Amino acid sequence: MDPRLENGSFKIVDWPLSEVRLKDNVHFPWIILIPRVSSSITEIFQLSIEEQKMLMDEITKLSSCLHSHFKPTKINVGALGNIVSQLHIHVIARYEQDPCWPQSVWQANVPEKSYPTDTRDQLIHQLRALLS
């Protein structure tokens, strides 16, 4: 796993294809799916058809869980990879009152803020129960 993905996030659970991680940014419920495939895979189309289906199933399951649990205005899903090329998918619960709305989380000039330890641990516990 690219160290930039690992260092800025916390493992929640393993799914059939992907490791599911919480991004350390208190502004949003922000989950990253990191498929356990070769690091040379940088695009979704490079996955096998079966892996593509598994990834779409995981994105759908995660989006649905975040939507029902957090009640956001919108779920943002993206696979950019301009900075970290290893294939990974961002699934972010967004609210009209969040500090970046309506821009993307990358466009807005809002510094990331880490979770307080207690809040982070509690959220990881909730997400593990929700996503296991």
Where do the protein language model's features map onto the residues?
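HIT superfamily nucleotide-processing domains
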Residues: 1-87, 91-132
